[in-house]
Amino acid sequence: VILDLEDSVGAADKAAARDHIAAFLDEVTDAQVLLRINAADTIHYHLDLALAQHPNLAGVILPKAEAQSTNATADILSCPLWPLIESVRGLSELPATVRVPGVARLLYGTLDLALELGLDSNQEGGLSMLNQGRFLLLTESLMAGLPAPIDGVCPAVHDDDQLRRTAQYSYAAGMGGMMCIHPKQVALVESIFTPSEAQIEWARAVEKAAVTQHSSFQFRGQMVDEPVLKLARKIVARSK
């Protein structure tokens, strides 16, 4: 769950939002809660950082993340940092950003990046450009030993068909999950990014069969080598 202090909260309401979030965090001890603070170049950043020290937070999301702001924020925090990459500079500085100690996972801010570049993500050309960003996030995450990045939101809150297509596309593109802009989107997105029972059964069976093998082997008519075994392990990990 992401508690947001940035775009969803107007400037006049940010102080009250911090108070409400602090009160909520005081009441929870085992919730997996991330806090999205305001960007480092805003007047709200340092006030948000004080709240970001709360011990019941699982992590902090830094919007408009670049290498310098990621490094400065990670130095202050005691919890994992999730940089939200949503600018051209953020993309260009990914090799440095992913290697900042404390960075847990990348998120992809497709809406803001599309706005900066003047892209229409509903058209093939705009989608193709955003895919180049996905490729960069995926490869840099892999090189740094981070989990697959989390994709941007689908703004169509009341269009389940569009949400399904967007989530399926994101899953096929190798992304590790997808942010939701509204709670009603969670169940559908989760169902797409969660392996099916058949996939889980296959993956566990492959892992079990591999225990007694020392090289490539055949399993249910399929050749299993190291890449296939890695896929099976990834499916099992996702199922958890």
Q: Model-found features: residue ranges?
A:
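Expand to "…catalyze enediolate/carbanion chemistry for C-C bond making/breaking, isomerization
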Residues: 1-240
